[in-house]
């Protein structure tokens, strides 16, 4: 949903018609309130919408809901994964003081990158208290990766930081990574991809040997690495790791 704010500074006004221009592919229609208008040739027209804009600096917020086409494999004739679409308000006809006027703004909503599904990535642990000395094979922290209900995702690389040695990462209880020696900033890499089913969540637990050189207990935990180093794909792509998507556009990566 994109929200447009319209202000009328010289008395109240009525928005009669609105026109939006759609760049890119994938937009089927826009909806304002209970009115839905289709995209025809990259243009969406709302005629006779008659929205009242009060006088003053607060104006009127207009939520515009966008319906996108499904993302499918290239040979299925749908919208390609990673297609980018932008919706721009390009014409406003309004009435104020008995006079009807048409203006041509260019107010674009944020561009949207379309995918078949997407992951939610979280660090869910709060750390573990380690006594002075060496503790071996202790569970240090936990991360989760969940696939959206709309489709499977493929995980290629999960970046994280941890202060430990002989690190083992378990996915839902099964070993998937073993790192001998000291590990700090590192990643669990799945060269052929780790598939997560639609609506499912995989828990990644990080174990390792921890040396606390102090005289008191200290808290140790894992942290997520840079979202730019998180590698994934929707199943539509089936891409190798070198061309996978990153986590920079994910709505939840924390």
Residue ranges of model-derived segments:
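Exposed, polar/acidic Ser/Thr-rich sequence context and nearby capping/turn residues
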Residues: 1-254
């Amino acid at each position: 949903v994109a929200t447009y704010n319209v202000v009328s500074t010289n008395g109240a006004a009525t928005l009669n018609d609105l026109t939006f221009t759609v760049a890119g592919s994938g937009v089927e229609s826009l909806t304002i309130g209970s009115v839905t208008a289709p995209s025809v040739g990259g243009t969406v027209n709302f005629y006779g919408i008659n929205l009242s804009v009060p006088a003053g600096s607060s104006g009127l917020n207009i939520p515009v809901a966008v319906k996108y086409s499904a993302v499918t494999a290239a040979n299925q004739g749908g919208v390609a994964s990673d297609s980018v679409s932008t919706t721009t308000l390009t014409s406003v006809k309004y009435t104020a003081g008995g006079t009807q006027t048409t203006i041509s703004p260019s107010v674009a909503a944020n561009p949207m990158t379309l995918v078949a599904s997407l992951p939610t990535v979280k660090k869910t642990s709060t750390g573990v208290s380690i006594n002075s000395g060496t503790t071996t094979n202790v569970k240090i922290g936990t991360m989760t990766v969940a696939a959206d209900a709309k489709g499977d995702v493929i995980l290629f690389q999960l970046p994280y930081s941890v202060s430990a040695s002989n690190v083992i990462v378990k996915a839902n209880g099964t070993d998937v990574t073993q790192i001998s020696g000291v590990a700090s900033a590192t990643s669990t890499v799945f060269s052929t991809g780790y598939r997560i089913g639609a609506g499912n969540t995989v828990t990644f637990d990080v174990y390792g040997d921890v040396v606390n050189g102090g005289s008191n207990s200290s808290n140790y935990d894992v942290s997520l690495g840079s979202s730019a180093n998180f590698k994934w794909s929707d199943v539509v792509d089936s891409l190798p790791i070198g061309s996978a998507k990153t986590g920079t556009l994910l709505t939840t990566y924390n």
